[in-house]
Amino acid sequence: MKKRKWATLSAVVGTAVLLLSACGPGDDNSSGSQPASTGTKTLLVWEDVKKADGIQDAVKEFEKQHDVKIKVVEKAYADQIEALRLDGAAGTGPDVITMPHDQIGSAVTEGLLQEIKPDQKVIDSFTDESIQSQTVNGKLYGLPKSVETTVLFYNKDLVKKAPTTLDGWYDLSKKLTKDGKYGFVAKWDEIYYAQSVLGGSGGYIFKQKSDGSYDVNDIGLNNDGAIEGGEYIQKFFSEGLFPKGIIGEQGINVLNSLFTEKKAAALISGPWSFGPYKEAGIDYGVTELPTLPNGKHMSSFLGVKSYNVSSYSKNKELAEKFVEFITNEKNSKKRFEVTEEIPPVKKLMKDPIITENANANAVSKQTKYATLTPNNPEMAEVWKPIDSALRLIATGRTDVKKAFDDAVKQIDSQIKANHSK
C-alpha cells in the first residue's frame, strides 16, 4: 500500500511508546526479546499509530497466561518494515510488527519475516483472501489484522439519495459543479483509486494464476478494458468535473478539504476517513462503489493489515503465539470495538457488530468486488509509472493509450532490471 496515502489525514505522530507491562518510565531498553532482570521473557511489539488501545486488554491477558512482559511501541504501520531493516540488524528491533500486505513479498525476499505455522483451524478462521495476502511461495508469514478498501462517501445534506451508478454521479456532478463547488470527486490520477474504474473495465496489474501467484509478464494496464476505463476517467477531468487541484501528490489534501468544507457532495475514500470526516462535522453516508457504464461494479484494491513475526526475534515461538492470540475472534472483536478496523475473521464478518455498523458494512460489501493489491516484490515497480501516466491523462497532455503503453513498457523494463533471477 502506498505510504503517502496515510500521512495526509492527520499530522505524522512521532514514535509513541506505550508500556503495557512492568517496564517503568526509567526503562530505556527498546530492544526486543531481551530477558528482564527477573528472568521473565519480554516481547517488543510494534503497533500502528493510535491503535495500541485496541490491544491493551489482550496484551495484559497474554502476559498473565505466558509469564511474559510485553512492550508496545506505536509506529506508522507502513513504515515499520523500513525501520525493521535497521533495528533488526542492530539487535534492537521488534518481535512482532504490523504492516500492509503489499510489502510482504519484498520483506520475505529480504529475509525480514519469519514463516509461521499455525494450526489449520486457525488459518480457516480467516477469509481466504486475507490468508492469501500473507502467503508467499506457499508459505505463511503472518495473520490478518484488518481489511480495508475504498468506498463512496456522500454528504447527506447535499445528496438526499445517492446514485447507484457512476453515470448517475456524472449527471449529478454536471448539475452541482459551479462556483468552486463540485458533485462527485475522486483521486483518479493515482492507481490506488483509479483501479476502481480500470479494474471494473477489465484492466489489471498482473494476471493472477490459479495458485494465487502473479504472472509479472502479463501486465493488463494497457489492455482494451484499461484504455476504456482511462478514457472514462479523462472525461471527468476534461469536462471540469474534477478540480485541477486534486492532481498530484498533495491533491489528496485538496480532495479531503473539498469534502470537509462541504464543497464536494461525494468522494471515494476509505476507512481511514471515518474518524476525520466525523470530527469535521460532516453528516455523511457510506456505500459500496457504484456500477460502471458496462453494468459491472467498480472494483477496488483490497488491503490487508497483518501481524508478523520478525526473523530477528529471539523468541519466535512465543511471538507466533502472540500473533495467533491477538488475531483470534475474541480479541479481533474487541479491537474492532475500539479502533473500527475491520477484522477478516469469518464469524465476525457475519456478526451484528459488523453488519449493523453502516461504515463497516459498506466496506464489507465492497470487498466482494475488490481484488488484493499484489504482494509480490515486482509490485514496487508499478506505482510510479502508472501514476505518472494517470496524471498525464488527467491533465490532457497525452492520449490514454500512449500513456498506458509507455507506463507498461517502463514497468516491464524495471521488473527485468531489478527482479530477474
Predicted region positions:
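A structural signal for short loop-to-beta-strand junctions that line the ligand-binding cleft
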Residues: 87, 94-95, 123-156, 182-187, ...
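Glycine-centered hinge/linker elements that transmit conformational signals in sensory
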Residues: 173, 215-247
